[in-house]
UniProtKB/Swiss-Prot annotation:
This is GTPase Der. Associates with the 50S ribosomal subunit. GTP 1 binds at residues 10-17, 57-61, 120-123. GTP 2 binds at residues 183-190, 230-234, 295-298. Signal peptide: none annotated. Residues 353-437 form the KH-like domain. The gene is der. GTPase that plays an essential role in the late steps of ribosome biogenesis. Residues 4-168, 177-352 form the EngA-type G domain.
Length: 439
């Protein structure tokens, strides 16, 4: 049995993201005093009274708005309601009961899911009376809280976990492969993830930047279990004017940090940009597994040499990571979609690969025989022993006479030898050098 899912729903700006972040213990959703700022579902793991569960923060519901984004947010909330075991219906105790609350309540009653009515922004004891009018919603006794001050959260969670079945409380931590999809706005990240998930999971529209935060989705396939992280598209700084866009840039870097595999998506009709190089360069610098996907390949006029030519140009622009894997797809038509997670899994397998110490030392000894280390100053590097000390990425320690003797060109040679012999395609690897006195 998987972990129970708790969805936090309500009209815009009632404090859902603030509550979500308090419960998650970290800043996950973009929070700003602008209605509609949380535009997509965001997941986080939480625990209360030994019950582990997954929370979903939804975009605010505005049932009568015709705005394209708000209508899609409403659809997202409906999907969250369909998925949830328990729903926290958050309302604003300062503003009081609003017509939109009535309509949200109707949606929730139709869901026939357990609902905990929570009145937020009750910052003082005297404000408790503000909660009484919410009895009119017909959803039961309201719980009063102040999410910004973390007041009343324990009482609220007590009510939530009452609805969990006993056999749902022991969900185990997922051993999932985390994949971050990164790239410029409107390159097709959300469209690809939706294809992989088989549901309209993310806000997809022709408006650049419709994914403003980093969103997690889960999918199980024959190749493994994956967490798919869709990030806000990164723009040049001159174009990033809104405060909210700055948050999203930070979130993209944070998503790369927690990813196992980073997929850089490039628009085949536009090619690679400096911004693409910068963001994937960060993933390279911290030694992530990397897959470069060229999307919208269906829009390119081509012959039998077009793909090779395109790949060569990419490799020139991404020469700092010659190990990256490449895939040409069309998220719109489904071309080569089945290979996306398969190839990502191959990258992950190399990212977590271990090499036996004996075999490793045989390869390095052979490499030294083929190419002796250069003399640096008056010393020649001597390599006594090498061992792998970790994965994610594969990390190797070379015990040598003097780490100062390692020339960058010889270090690159050793890395290439490891790659050629053990197939680390698609992942960064780390080489460290430590001094050891000769016996």
């Amino acid at each position: 049995m998987g972990k129970p899912i708790v969805a936090i729903v309500g009209r815009p700006n009632v404090g859902k993201s603030t509550l979500f972040n308090k419960l998650a213990g970290k800043r996950i959703a973009i929070v700003q005093d602008t209605p509609g700022v949380t535009r997509d579902r965001i997941y986080a793991e939480a625990e209360w009274l030994n019950y582990k569960f997954t929370m979903i923060d939804t975009g605010g519901i505005e049932p009568k708005s015709e705005d394209i984004i708000v209508s899609q947010m409403r659809r997202q909330a409906q999907i969250a309601i369909e998925m949830a075991n328990v729903i926290i219906f958050l309302v604003d105790g300062k503003e009081g009961l609003a017509p939109a609350d009535e309509e949200v309540a109707q949606m929730l009653r139709k869901s026939k899911k357990p609902v905990v009515l929570v009145v937020n922004k009750i910052d003082k004891l005297k404000d408790e009376n503000n909660a009484y009018e919410f009895y009119n919603l017909g959803i039961g006794d309201p719980v009063t809280i102040s999410s910004s001050q973390a007041l009343g959260l324990g009482d609220m969670l007590d009510r939530v976990v009452e609805y969990f079945k006993d056999d749902e409380s022991d969900g185990e931590d997922d051993e999932r492969i985390n994949i971050a999809f990164i790239g410029k706005p409107n390159v097709g990240k959300s469209s690809l993830i939706n294809k992989l998930l088989g549901e309209e999971r993310l806000i997809v529209s022709d408006i650049p930047g419709t994914t403003r935060d980093s969103i997690d989705s889960y999918v199980d396939t024959e190749f493994g279990e994956f967490t798919l992280i869709d990030t806000a598209g990164l723009r040049r700084k001159s174009k990033v004017k809104e405060e909210i866009e700055r948050y999203s840039v930070i979130r993209t870097y944070a998503s790369i940090e927690r990813a196992d595999v980073c997929i850089l998506m490039i628009d085949a009709t536009e090619g690679i940009s400096e911004q693409d190089q910068k963001i994937i360069g960060y993933a390279h610098d911290i030694n992530k597994a990397i897959l470069v996907i060229v999307n919208k390949w269906d829009l390119v006029e081509k012959d039998d040499k077009t793909m090779d030519k395109f790949k060569k140009e990419l490799k020139v622009n991404l020469s700092f990571m010659p190990y990256a894997k490449y895939l040409f797809i069309s998220a719109k038509t489904g071309q080569r979609i089945v290979k996306v997670l398969q190839t990502a899994k191959e990258c992950y397998d190399n990212y977590t690969k271990r090499v036996k110490t004996g075999v490793l030392n045989d390869v390095i000894s052979q490499a030294i025989m083929m190419k002796e280390p250069p003399i640096v100053g008056t010393k020649r590097l001597k390599i006594y022993y090498v061992t792998q000390i970790g994965t994610k990425p594969p990390t190797f320690i070379f015990f040598v006479n003097d780490p100062a003797c390692i020339h960058f060109s010889y270090q690159r040679y050793l890395e290439n030898q490891l790659r050629e012999n053990f197939d680390f395609q698609g992942t960064g690897i780390k080489l460290e050098f430590r001094e050891r006195k000769e016996k």
